[in-house]
Regions:
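His/Glu-rich zincin catalytic helix
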Residues: 1-90, 102-105, 115-116, 175
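Acidic/histidine-enriched segments that form metal/cofactor-coordinating
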Residues: 85-176
């Protein structure tokens, strides 16, 4: 019986990654724009990053996460359902948070996608109903983590490493 050859094959050549230098400019409102063009694929990616310094939320810990969960649920101009249906119709991958937004789609829809992204960021629709649902979800998540050893260990490590008054050392409670 012959032994199976299990020697590792020699690696092939590493691909060459060529990222062009971004074009940069500043809009009238002070927003810095970086553009990197690559026309090999018919897709476009947008990334909005808000330069928010970390801050201690104190007795309001969880507001940032709650805001992140609420943003992108429609806008003051468009209902949540219509907003989500249009995103689905265009086949867009769009995400919002309190720190910015990202969107990926086919480049032929880029104008409308950028409009939807701006609408969601500049005119978010925070309804009481959505607020109550998201708050309930956060509370349920915290209750589930009460008995999770990794979650408890992570909290302890963060408090010991950063202190309880540091943004990373804080943790959410039902009261906050």
């Amino acid at each position: 019986m012959q032994a199976t050859d299990r020697t590792q094959p020699k690696p092939g050549k590493s691909p060459i990654i060529n990222i062009k230098k971004p074009q940069s400019f500043v809009l009238d409102n002070g927003m810095k724009i970086l553009v990197v063009e690559n026309h090999k694929l018919p897709k476009v990616s947008f990334n909005l990053t808000l330069d928010n310094a970390p801050f201690a939320e104190g007795n309001k810990k969880g507001v940032d996460e709650l805001t992140s969960n609420l943003i992108g649920n429609g806008s003051k101009k468009t209902t949540k359902t219509a907003f989500n249906e249009e995103i689905d119709f265009w086949g867009v991958d769009i995400n919002f948070s309190s720190h910015g937004a990202t969107a990926n789609s086919l480049s032929k829809y880029s104008g409308r996608i950028l409009e939807l992204m701006a609408e969601g960021v500049l005119h978010p629709n925070f309804t009481q109903e959505d607020f109550d649902k998201e708050k309930a979800k956060l509370i349920e998540g915290m209750k589930a983590e009460e008995k999770s050893v990794p979650a408890i260990a992570s909290r302890v490590v963060d408090v010991l490493a950063f202190g309880k008054n540091h943004p990373t050392g804080e943790f959410m409670t039902e009261e906050t």
